[in-house]
Amino acid sequence: MGNCVARSGTAVDAGGDGGEDGKRRRRRWKAPREDQLGMVPGRIFSNDGRSRTATVYTQQGRKGINQDAMLVWDGFGGEDDGVLCGVFDGHGPHGHVVARRVRDSLPLRLMSAARDSGADMPAAAWRKAFARAYKAMDKDLRSHPSLDCFCSGSTAVTVLKLGSDLYMANIGDSRAVLGSREATGGGMVAVQLTVDLKPDVPSEAERIKKCRGRVFALQDEPEVPRVWLPFDDAPGLAMARAFGDFCLKDYGVISVPEFFHWSLTEKDQFVILASDGVWDVLSNQEAVDIVSASPSRSKAAKSLVEAATREWKTKYPTSKIDDCAVVCLYLDGKMDHERDSTASLDNISIEEGSVADPNEPQEQEPTLTRNFTVRTVAGSTQEKTLAGVDARIAGVANDQNWSGLDGVTRVNSLVQLPRFSEERAIG
């Protein structure tokens, strides 16, 4: 990243090795090898399925190969109450490969980072562990011998549930939203747990410009701010943080995650993680209402994806539907036991999502995002403060306006590839 540095909140060292408790934690949090992932119980990464705590679903859009990837890992780190969930939205020519690489490798790096910390890790220690894991993941992508990430990358939103705590980290515009019951009336309220890290966030734009990157929107899509090289109108990345995208890493785009901590209460019911294909057309509250109304928990993720697909067709009939990926994590750890589930979740790997209409032309360009949703309900749980948030972006989620694709027929994460070679850019 040259001289550009992240401006996230400062991580506090947990200190100490935790004595015998720390040694036991390090034994439990021993990461398996990547070639052993398929044999790990409780780890699911299929395109449609459920675990004992979560349900997942993805559907391919109309722009080519599905570049979204998902993960649920029950018993993460050997903890009975540990669950790690993630959604990864790739972009660029090799975005689908990047997203799957992150899906498989990032949890192992987080496990290793946690193993090196003391027992009973506080939020500050988890902030540090997530930061180390994300940094190691991006380093792995840069040095990978056969994966070209120069103009390809991926978002990441990860949620780790340990007991009554949620620890979250994200880069890009995939999002986590909490469904919680209102104190009075029993209705559901949506609480946005992460912030969409796009170039129009003031602190993100400031960093990019200080690193000589440019931020502006094209005339035909004025609501989509993008990141451009200082000497070329490329690549036009529509997010401020991402894995990969090394053509922009010297110009302000970073892979340092924003970290969030949430203490759960009995009113908190579930967490939705989804790619921007969902949030471009549905508000947080609409998504929570759809999941809450699902007659079957095991079908909740599929119901939300199908609702988003219908909204794309209804609201933006001239737009190409984006890939949609959803993970629904139920915080009580329970899942209904239907026998008609389309997949058992342990140790399944189906690399492609639902198949697109073969009669509709496919485009090989990745997708992109948009400014979108957050509606604060006065007096609701949504007014609770997220711990660990950088003060300069703490209010961004509530300040973001819900904005669909009005007047835009097609939105991609990248506009075009740079005209120069990687050797020229690095040299």
From Swiss-Prot:
Pfam families: PP2C. Keywords: Hydrolase, Magnesium, Manganese, Metal-binding, Protein phosphatase. Mn(2+) 2 binds at residues 89, 276, 322. Its cofactor is Mg(2+); Mn(2+). Residues 1-36 are annotated as: Disordered. InterPro entries: PP2C (IPR015655), PPM-type-like_dom_sf (IPR036457), PPM-type_phosphatase-like_dom (IPR001932). Its EC number is 3.1.3.16. The keyword Manganese applies. Belongs to the PP2C family. This is Probable protein phosphatase 2C 64. It comes from Oryza sativa subsp. japonica (Rice). The lineage of its organism: Eukaryota, Viridiplantae, Streptophyta, Embryophyta, Tracheophyta.
